[in-house]
Amino acid sequence: MKKTVSILLACALALCLLSACGGEAAEPEFGDVTAAIDSAVDTSSMTEADASYIQGMFGLREGDYEACRVLLTGVGTNIDELGLFKGADASQAERLKTAVTDYLQLRLNSWMPEYLPDEFPKLQNAKLWTEGSYVMYAILSDDGREAALEAFEGCFG
């Protein structure tokens, strides 16, 4: 009897362990992440950067990322900017993170103090976030940055 109970307990334990070994949750689709961000942050006055901007400013060519979208202000009175990159794998995502970090540093280093001084805190407080193979950055107001982050993180819930 003891042996039967031990075998049943061992089988139950093995079954529990196997069911807990499910694969990682699938990452959200790029379009779903951009839609979530667009619903949280007013991007209506922003324009999408083209491949030449991405290459010139980030040093990234098509093929260095699976998908990307960089939105730049279309208004000359603010510096709002929001970017989302998706790498094909973890190593590509790490390279994207480095490229975005370098880009944000370039923006800081090239800032002219007399140009829109009230906007400079947005650049100083710019943030970069990563989740899985995604890299996102935001040069936005405090509220805009928080809304973008909340929308981004909500996609990975």
Q: Where do the language-model regions lie?
A:
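Positively charged n-region of N-terminal signal peptides that target proteins for export
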Residues: 1-9
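C-terminal motif of bacterial Sec signal peptides marking the signal peptidase cleavage site
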Residues: 16-20
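Post-signal peptide N-terminal segment of mature Sec-exported envelope proteins
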Residues: 28-47
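Short, compositionally biased low-complexity segments enriched in polar/charged residues
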Residues: 48-79, 92-96, 124-125
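A short, solvent-exposed beta-edge/loop patch
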Residues: 74, 118-157
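Short Gly/Thr-rich strand-loop-strand
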Residues: 93-130
